[in-house]
Amino acid sequence: MTQIELALAADSSTRHLSCLETGRAEPSREIIGRFAQCLNVPLRDQNALLLAAGFAPAFPERSVGELEAAKRAMDSVLQAHLPYPAFAVDRHWNVVLSNSAIPELYEGVSDELRRRPINAVRLVLHPDGMGPRILNYAEWQAYTVQVLRSQVQKQPDAGIQALLAEVLAYPAPTRSNCRQPFDDAQRLATPIRIATRFGTVSFLNTLTVFGTPSDVTLAELALEMLFAADEETVEIVKVMERERFATVAVAS
């Protein structure tokens, strides 16, 4: 966006914008908000800009527990997505809410990685997590690195930068099939392929965010949902569900 385009979008003038850039004029609270909105500045950074200019933050930052209506909405979506996995993550990819789908996916994951806050990235790629059972590990690691790098570029954050460096340092799984590329010219998206004791399951993932957040925490939450990528996965999940229900029935 050019200076002229920004000034027009913010209903200001290039002269005033130039004066703000050179320090010959002090920004008002209103003009900071207008410029920030035109530049799609995240709410957290908008608050930081206001504080730097001597103003109070415009957007509250509540805990997830305080966001009652949003939490109910997320819980509803997560539970409706059963029997497939779905979870809500914060800006550092820590899981804040989840459903109880397919515990078989997490068999063999270390107790350390299961302790709260559970980090979704570590859970999937760490050598002590699901990493050794991700059959297209290289693909999924590359996808994750791309997502984290994009996140850092849009909103630099020490926590995300550290997580990115950690993921890049993970050793590739030693199992040969974990290095296997899955080339498919007809494929529209990259699934995650996971080896389980029931067979290989493949999932496509989607990320959903709130459209009009006015709270910093809510603006940084995302719902990640996994969908079966093939009929084999649909059938395996059904088998998992039947076995789990049978186990519960025997235990009761």
Annotate the PLM regions.
Residues 1-7:
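Short basic helix-loop element that most often maps to the first helix and adjoining turn
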Residues 29-33, 37-68:
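Short amphipathic recognition helices of helix-turn-helix/homeodomain-type DNA-binding modules
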Residues 72-85, 89, 96-251:
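Hydrophobic protein-protein interaction segments
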Residues 10-26, 36:
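Recognition helix of helix-turn-helix/homeodomain-like DNA-binding domains
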Residues 3, 14, 29-32:
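Helix-turn-helix DNA-binding elements, focusing on the entry/boundary residues of the two helices
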Residues 5, 16, 45:
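Residues in the helix-turn-helix
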